Amino acid sequence: MVPAPTSTTPSVAVPKSATPQLSAPQSPTAQSLAAQSSASQPSAVHLGAAERDLRLDLFRGLALWLIFLDHIPENIVSWITIRNYGFSDATEIFIFISGYTAAFVYGRTMGERGFVLASARILRRAWQIYVAHIFLFTIFMAEIAYVAATFENPLYAEEMNILDFLKQPDVTIFQALLLKFKPVNMDVLPLYIVLLLLFPPMLYLLLRAPNLALAGSAVVYALAWKLDFNLPAYPNGVWFFNPFAWQLLFVFGAWCALGGAHRLRHVMQSRAVLVVAIAYLLFAFAITLTWHVESLERFVPTWLADWMYPIDKTNLDVLRFAHFLALAAVTVRFVPRDWPGLRSPILRPAIVCGQHSLEIFCLGVFLAFAGQFIIAETSGGPLLQTAVSVLGIILMVATAYLISWYKTMEGRNPRSRVKPPDADLAGGEA
Amino acid sequence: MRVITGILASIVLVGAAIAAAEPQSDCDVPEWLIPAQSNLNRVTSAIKDHHRLDVSVIGSRSSALSGPDGARFSYPAQLEQTLRERLPGNDIKVTAHIASGQTTAEMAADLPKVLAEDRPALAIWQAGTVDALRGVEPEDFRVSLDQGLDAIAAGNADALMMNMQYSPRTESMLSVAPFADVMHWVAEQRGVVLFDRLAIMRYWSDEGTFDLYAATTGYAMARHVHECIGRALAAQIIDAAHLDADKMQTTR
């Protein structure tokens, strides 16, 4: 396996206090904001614990946009996405925030109503995501079948072999149902499903001994690197996102939600951490610059390149994890929880998208397929790529507002109040 | 004065070299896509000392063309022709070994045999597509590349790697990027020349040189693409081996 860089082991400061702490600190502003956004879910207010941090919705919404843009190959607009300016990308943000909200929502359920009910809800959520994934797979199959039927070019005789799986639909569809066969760009939801399936016991531990749970997660991560284990894929190979590596980010998010962020606040507010984080972000930026400007490559010393490359996305390279931590540290510093901008109408669309992440994520994957199809059919240039990107984001936002409206309407229906709080609690999803 | 004369002379020489290097074609490749980062010492000495160059191309199906007279229009044949044109007076032979459907690991295992048979000064190794098709792990792919490059070095040949084709229509199904990254990294680490077919074809697509999205059953475009690849490949070899045609003539 690739030599794992050793000097930047996950720099998670583990504070001494191990008291299970369900509620993160709250400011009145944040509380009123969350209450406002969760008007449709009275139970959230009634529980009275910490309210939702709108920054989570904002950054998850932005991550969903970036994932959409990155999933359209040959998209000039994808130059603005963060993967071009550092090691980590929107996936890290998405998984971290998903872990955070999962712990926030189900942690409370587990604390108040017990392990069994919380686990049942987590598994129901995993099932919903599974169904969404299979739905996307169907759309993907339709696209592939179309290409297979219409596209031919002797130049690509070899590449067209990828369509061979259509000759064995029995095997292919079965492997897809087992989450072993996953088309390009359809790896995130299966990862999410596995993370949720393993989450109940992890959450149980996180509520009792959060630091122990986090340490356990780090050990699994290290073992995945050391012993090189991953889930098998079909027809060959392994999962693109190794769940045993990526769980670290998910659990870290959960740990932060259950009081870890509060315990880390002194670390996050320290000047030294800020300086280190900014320095690291600049370093990552400089390195990524050499990927795009070939002539700069020679400025990367050989010893550094040998030590650093390849930066492994499959196993969540430590460099990527550290980059995410640095980004988070800088963000937390400059975007406080009660930042007035969170209420500005400009950021509202991203926040609304972040509050309905599963639907918007799926829509984004579908729109990326569709957009790519349009670009391919018309051999479109940068102008069309820009139009497709902008239109896609507008559709994502419009759909998110529609879902919000729909949920508000349902929430006003007295009968639906009987419904138990779901993952959609407080206007967001786990 | 001598300095100025020297500078002037070099400008003239460089100008002549550029004029000679620029093929009269519609598929030029900008310099930044053909970085002259490495030396092909064995190629240089084969031409300078023996006026002879044997090249072996080892690749999968995208190194060949089907259809009538496919071999004659595929890039290995085009490479041979261009090298003969640009290095006149030398005995040049390009042999293609097409291993249809073979992964990099399988090709790496066969390399010693090919090298023993051909005894080439240069081995061009096209890899990656089959591995992407079969979902080989990028890390295993890297190990196979290393093994193959060791075999080429042991066979006393210079190595040149070629990555996969740019295929926009299959991009949503076939993810070649991780394999391209590995090849780039291995090339960098070992100081091996990489012919970046992926980037070059993408450049042609972006520039409108070829409509690589187009569906066609005809061979015209495929042949034209191979011709252009053969020429670009010849240019990179001549560049990396410092065999600029004009300088060669002056040294002889």
Feature locations, PLM:
Chain B
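N-terminal signal peptide c-region/cleavage motif recognized by signal peptidases
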Residues: 14-20
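Internal alpha/beta domain cores that form substrate/cofactor-binding pockets in large enzymes
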Residues: 54-56, 90-118, 130-161
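Short, solvent-exposed loop/turn segments at secondary-structure boundaries
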Residues: 66-71, 135-139, 171-175
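Sec-dependent signal peptide recognition
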Residues: 2-9
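Catalytic His-Asp segment of secreted/periplasmic serine-dependent ester chemistry enzymes
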Residues: 167-252
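Serine-esterase "nucleophile elbow" of acetyl-processing enzymes
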Residues: 24-96, 112-119
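Active-site segments of SGNH/GDSL-like serine hydrolases
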Residues: 126-129, 148-180
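Solvent-exposed loop/turn segments at secondary-structure junctions
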Residues: 61-64, 99-105, 128-134, 165-169, ...
